[in-house]
Amino acid sequence: MLYRIYSLFLFFFLSKSLSAQIVDDSTRQIYGLSSVQYQLEKDILNNKVKIYHPDSTLGTFALVDTIAKSSFQFQHLGNLGTAAKWIGWRTEEEVNTPLYFSPFGLYAFQKEHIKYFNTKSPFTNMHYVQGSRNFAVLDFTHSQNINERLNITLDINRFSASKQFGFTGSSREERLVDHWAVHVSSNYTDKKGKYLLLTHYNHLNHKQNEQGGVQGFETLDLSLATISPEYTDYQAQLASAYSREYWNDWHIYHQYKLAKKEGFTLFHQLDYGYQKMFFIDAAYGRNKASEVYPTSNSVADTAVLFVRYRSLNQSFGLKGSWKGFGYNAYINPRLYRRVGVEDSRNTTPWQFETFVGGRLNYATKDSTLVLQTHVKLGTNGGFLLIGKGVYRRFGINFKQIRRPTSLFEQSFFSEFISWSSDFNQTFTQELGTSFP
């Protein structure tokens, strides 16, 4: 009898204890993807209040190669991280003087896609993939609010890939590509919401060991063993050459509201870029006879290309919105130069150019009709006119752009190839439509 009474008492006590620990979900703070939000600078600049949340779907989870993530709009040399170029027609919506052609720029963090977070709790996202062809990819993001108005975010992209042919030793894991991309971003808003600051540091360090393709078949024994699928036995044309691209870019955007409403806001953008481009062939004296290099009378044993680029770009302007209309007007001064570290012929003086421009947008409350225009004029002869319109998912757009050729296209000097040309500016007109 005492045993039954004790058991009943124990059951009643535990039931009360367990029921006391149940918390009503309606009163408990739950953190997750819904409490993590971010904005893009282009939306803020164009007077759009648009909030995004991290995507938890697995639609593109299996896409590892950057080329696949771009919907195969780029083409590389067949291996992860190798030099890539755009394969279609793409109009650059810019009129400043380009500095260089970047074969590895695709693998850097793109300024227009950098996310400025606001998190209620620390947010971390990590993705690691190791492939059967000796490649590895790591993506790591950590974002955390220091307080309710200040956030700091770290984003890292790291990958490496091994050679598929042209091995110089017995190992089948010789490195072909070594890549680091890092950006640190922060954003701050004052108590009254009048002042907003967005800033980031963007770094790229990308190295590719150059192979120059497979050696000509006239040097190979065309036996059944040679032409078998064991392509790892093929030899590369180059064995001691590599390219490297190195970026250090700093960016600041800040704005201050002159009125409580969105009618008048001052903004300022500042970009400082420092890029280094390397190409080194330590066996150039032997390799210059290959098909990789053009005919040259150089007697150098080593080929070294080392060029630095610097640029300082600013925009000062006024923006706002009123009854469905949004506008901004700005003046954009820019300084840039190139320094030839190994060949002074590649060095240019500091060059200065100035642009003035503006945007005017309109959208109905339900976004049934959206109109956008952008005009920009430069002292370098550059001109940009863009018009876009969307009505119930039917769209039309027009672009007219005149832009100078890049410093790289205008002139370049090296041991094995040189040119100096007086190209005209590129002129583009584009008309496009879109429909469901």
Describe the residue ranges of each PLM region.
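Membrane-proximal, glycine/serine-rich, low-complexity loop/turn segments characteristic
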Residues: 20-222, 257-261, 390-392
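N-terminal start-of-domain structural block
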Residues: 20-79, 220-299, 384-386, 398, ...
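A short linear-motif detector with a strong N-terminal bias
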Residues: 102-107, 130-134, 176, 230-233, ...
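Exposed, low-structure sequence patches enriched in small/polar residues
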Residues: 119-121, 244-283, 298-436
